[in-house]
Amino acid sequence: MARILIVDDSPTEMYKLTAMLEKHGHQVLKAENGGDGVALARQEKPDVVLMDIVMPGLNGFQATRQLTKDAETSAIPVIIVTTKDQETDKVWGKRQGARDYLTKPVDEETLLKTINAVLAG
């Protein structure tokens, strides 16, 4: 199955997403902020990144832009998973290079379908 990096500063959200993904056989890597997420993505080269937006330090938009503009990580798809549901945030996320944008709380079926679609290309 896929190696998925979750970048989220909420322990509760990290737990929920990890449980959903591991239940379906995915390997989960974790980072609690954007800077650590970018560093871990460069080091581990996950198949996909699930990125929150609101985090201390480097926010999810900034981290997504860094990942998608870096030759080392530009092929790694980023899916934003956040509580921010404004249309302007969705547009901005896509402009930063995110492949998709999901609003929390996200149900398991939607999350898995989105990951599979992004991985399929």
From Swiss-Prot:
GO terms for biological process: phosphorelay signal transduction system. The modification 4-aspartylphosphate is found at residue 52. It comes from the Bacteria. SMART domains: REC. Coiled coil: none annotated. Residues 3-119 form the Response regulatory domain. Disulfide bonds: none annotated. Keywords: Phosphoprotein, Two-component regulatory system. May be a part of a signal-transduction system that regulates twitching motility by controlling pilus function (extension and retraction). This is Protein PilH. It comes from Pseudomonas aeruginosa (strain ATCC 15692 / DSM 22644 / CIP 104116 / JCM 14847 / LMG 12228 / 1C / PRS 101 / PAO1). The lineage of its organism: Bacteria, Pseudomonadati, Pseudomonadota, Gammaproteobacteria, Pseudomonadales. The gene is pilH.
